[in-house]
Amino acid sequence: MSSYFVNSTFPVTLASGQESFLGQLPLYSSGYADPLRHYPAPYGPGPGQDKGFATSSYYPPAGGGYGRAAPCDYGPAPAFYREKESACALSGADEQPPFHPEPRKSDCAQDKSVFGETEEQKCSTPVYPWMQRMNSCNSSSFGPSGRRGRQTYTRYQTLELEKEFHYNRYLTRRRRIEIAHALCLTERQIKIWFQNRRMKWKKESKLLSASQLSAEEEEEKQAE
């Protein structure tokens, strides 16, 4: 038989005077005490004393130098704070101003006028050939497919170019730059316009000479 059931340190038969001593010791040598037996606690009265109320599991600190701590209040605090939060949320929703996602156009125009140039000021500023590649007064010369579109000239620009071509069919670089600045065109546009105009003039002169020759030949035939 194992020692778990019978303690080998004490004999089975003891004297009548030692039975009281046996009752104070545990019957198991494995180190586990009887769960039904109660021993006196080192602090305070034992649980065996008669009390009119149940003991609490909360113990104040033993070595507190600032006196005994006040008992904690475990009242229905969550319900109180929940009601308070709901009341605050309702009051905050009433005081919240309406939200405007899109600003007004007048405000945007005012901001542009204060912090930057407006569209009218940008168009009124002079643009020189070395500042911009294409013509700034006209629309973009490139179409949606990326190809260069046909350049259009105003009546004033065409009139001034025709006057210059009437006096000079070939322009110097200095004169070409002056005309480009005066007509708000690029130097390349002036150069291309004069090339096309010379080709047209040559074609017209050829047609005119051909018509003159044909007219002379008819006169000679009639004279014969």
UniProtKB/Swiss-Prot annotation:
InterPro entries, alphabetized: Antp_homeobox, HD, HD_metazoa, Homeobox_antennapedia, Homeobox_Antennapedia_CS, Homeobox_CS, Homeodomain-like_sf
Coiled coil feature spans: none
DNA-binding region: 146-205
Gene Ontology MF annotations: DNA-binding transcription factor activity, RNA polymerase II-specific; RNA binding; RNA polymerase II cis-regulatory region sequence-specific DNA binding; sequence-specific double-stranded DNA binding
Cellular component GO terms held in the UniProt record: chromatin; nucleus
GO biological process: anterior/posterior pattern specification; embryonic skeletal system morphogenesis; erythrocyte homeostasis; regulation of transcription by RNA polymerase II
Primary location recorded for the protein, binned into one broad class: nucleus
Keywords of the record: Developmental protein, DNA-binding, Homeobox, Nucleus, Phosphoprotein, Transcription, Transcription regulation
SUPFAM superfamilies recorded: Homeodomain-like
CDD domains: homeodomain
Localization, UniProt: Nucleus
Domain of life from the UniProt record: Eukaryota
Pfam families the UniProt entry points to: Homeodomain
Record PTM Phosphoserine, positions in chain: 214
Gene3D superfamilies in the record: Homeodomain-like (1.10.10.60)
Positions of short motif Antp-type hexapeptide: 127-132
Family the entry assigns: Belongs to the Antp homeobox family.
Chain's role: Sequence-specific transcription factor which is part of a developmental regulatory system that provides cells with specific positional identities on the anterior-posterior axis.
Protein name as annotated: Homeobox protein Hox-B6
Designated gene of the protein: HOXB6
